[in-house]
């Protein structure tokens, strides 16, 4: 029964992509270029991608999601305003481990549970924690660069798994891209069967040294969430899901660590909040979570 429900749910998502998406040539929007996934994503997708594309996989504690935050610099963003600890996290992500707690809106919790239970687990991708203590044993954080022959970092892979369940929470590919009429954005690509979910996040540097990454816009071509489906070898359907927005607020804490509030909204309604405590330590493993309720009380409100 679970398999049947999952198949129906996946078919419905594809139907929405075909109904609401625009048909495009793959090369017509390079800022959306990204790999599409097989039926199961799992832990090795990025290595298979590297092998197929002739890319070198580089690992190490100094590997970061962005080789240099200055890649995001524009008239509206100055990376030199970022707090050193925030900048170091993005440029040397492999040095850090993460603890995470989740808080779902009661209104959207049943939908989230069904989507993760019937779809995410089948494809081994995007298994958001449904309960605050679901990641109490910690989560892995494996960062690897995919580099072409010229030495250019094409994508940075960031794989995060729940140490308790072994489920893949995220298997994402990170880069920068500039949508039409916008400055450089953080680009994240989450491969899914026959396509991907691409999120373009507009950066903001705040006076306190914190960083905001915002995925929201009004029309196709703005930062936001794009659901992409491969239809033919060189053709895709691209659905700009305007109602789905995200906000990341990354800020330094007084104890020297970094914290992140991640808000997901649907047409302005709160869906999910994730809070990350990011500390320097053994690469690839996060420490056991302690008292999430007390920790969550320290979360800043990010609107």
How should each PLM-predicted stretch be described?
Residues 24-266, 270-275, 279, 290:
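Soluble ligand-binding/transfer domains with enclosed cavities or grooves
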């Amino acid at each position: 029964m679970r398999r049947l429900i999952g198949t129906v749910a996946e078919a419905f998502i594809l139907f929405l992509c075909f109904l609401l998406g625009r048909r495009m040539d793959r090369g017509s929007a390079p800022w959306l270029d990204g790999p599409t996934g097989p039926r199961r994503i799992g832990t090795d997708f990025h290595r298979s991608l590297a092998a197929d594309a002739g890319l070198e996989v580089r690992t190490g504690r100094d590997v970061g999601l962005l080789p240099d935050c200055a890649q995001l610099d524009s008239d509206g963003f100055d990376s030199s305003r970022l707090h050193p600890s925030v900048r170091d996290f993005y440029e040397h992500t492999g040095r850090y481990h993460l603890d995470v707690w989740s808080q779902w809106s009661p209104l959207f919790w049943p939908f989230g549970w069904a989507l993760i239970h019937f779809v995410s687990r089948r494809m081994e991708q995007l298994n958001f924690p449904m309960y605050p203590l679901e990641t109490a044993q910690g989560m892995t954080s494996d960062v690897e660069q995919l580099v072409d022959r010229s030495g250019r970092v094409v994508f940075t892979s960031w794989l995060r798994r729940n140490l308790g369940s072994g489920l893949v929470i995220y298997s994402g590919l990170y880069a920068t891209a500039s949508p039409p009429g916008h400055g450089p954005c953080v680009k994240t690509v989450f491969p899914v069967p026959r396509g991907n979910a691409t999120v373009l996040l507009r950066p903001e540097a705040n006076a306190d040294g914190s960083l905001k990454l915002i995925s929201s816009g009004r029309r196709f071509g703005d930062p936001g969430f794009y659901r992409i489906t491969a239809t033919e070898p060189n053709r895709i359907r691209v659905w700009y899901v305007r109602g789905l927005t995200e906000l990341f607020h990354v800020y330094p804490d007084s104890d020297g660590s970094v914290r992140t509030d991640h808000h997901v909204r649907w047409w302005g309604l709160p869906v999910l909040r994730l809070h990350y405590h990011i500390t320097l330590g053994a690469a690839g493993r996060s420490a056991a979570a302690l008292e999430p309720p007390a920790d969550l009380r320290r979360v800043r409100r990010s609107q």
